[in-house]
Amino acid sequence: MPTISTADFKNGLGLRIKDKVYTIVEFQHVKPGKGGAFVRYKTRDIKSGRVVENTCNAGTKFESVMLTTREFQYLYNDGADYIFMDNESYEQVPVPEDMVGENSKWLRENDICQLLFADDELMGVTPPMFIETTIVQTDPGFKGDTVQGSTKPATIETGAVIQVPMYLNEGEVIKVDTRDGKFVSRV
C-alpha cells in the first residue's frame, strides 16, 4: 500500500485510517517555538460524512487511497439493490440500498450519477446535481398565490416531498437541486 507523509497533505486527498477511508478537508502545519512540529487536520469519513479533527507529529506516514469518480447510468431497483451501468464498459454494478441511502429519493431511471471509488472499492453514489421532474401531487394553486416566499409541500415523481411556491400545480415540470432538496425553477 502506498504511504504518504504529512508534508504531502492536500485538500481532497484520500487516506485510510483504521480501515476507514477519509478525505482531507483542511490541514495546518504548526511549528511552535518550543517542542516538535505537528499537523492539525480535519478529515471527512467517505461513508458516513462525519468530519473528525485530529493532530499528529510532522512526518507521520499514512496509507494513501486513490479516490476516483466515474459516471454511471442508473437503470433500476430490483428490490434489494440499485443497478447502475458503467457508460464506458456497459458493465452493470449492483449497489446495496444502504449505500445509496437518502440519495435514493433523487434517482430516476436513465439518470447519469457519479459513483465514488477508493482503490476500486465502491464508496458512495451521488445523484445529478439538478433534476427536472414533474409534480405528481400538491394542493391546487389559486389566482393571486404569488406572495413572495410562501411555499407548500409537493410530491415529485421520485416520491420525494419538497417545498414549492404556491403558484405551482400538479403536472408542472420543475428543476430541483438534489444537494439540499430545494425548488430552483420552472422548466
Write out the residue ranges for each language-model feature.
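Acidic-enriched and Gly/Ser
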Residues: 2-157, 161-187
